[in-house]
């Protein structure tokens, strides 16, 4: 993963992407036991093209393609790792980028979303694998409950959390 992160850090240094943070299942491995995952989710801050209200990943893909990296579906294979770039288009993702934690992976500097932001994004996404990851976080005891509660309130996710609790946590704690 070191080489993959080196490419992403170079993209940031050259202004192709703004601030970034690792999210998804790989982000969760910084807090939980590693799980099988196929890709690295990289949430990125992107500038809108001048005169447009749309955010585009075209500069990211153009940059990587010009350096010989190949696309496979929604991923770009960077030094052996499938990477999915996800624009931070909402306030939750933007906050997650702002509050991401700096760390090192195999000597490469990077940023990873906080566990609480990973849970909030997974809750909003709402797939079965997201709920399973949330359960792992809850059972691990690594979450700051007050911080998670604040994030859920700020981003209108309290009702979804309550539904999650009823479905998955009632009687299990």
Residue ranges of each PLM-predicted region?
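Compositionally biased terminal segments of proteins
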Residues: 1-173
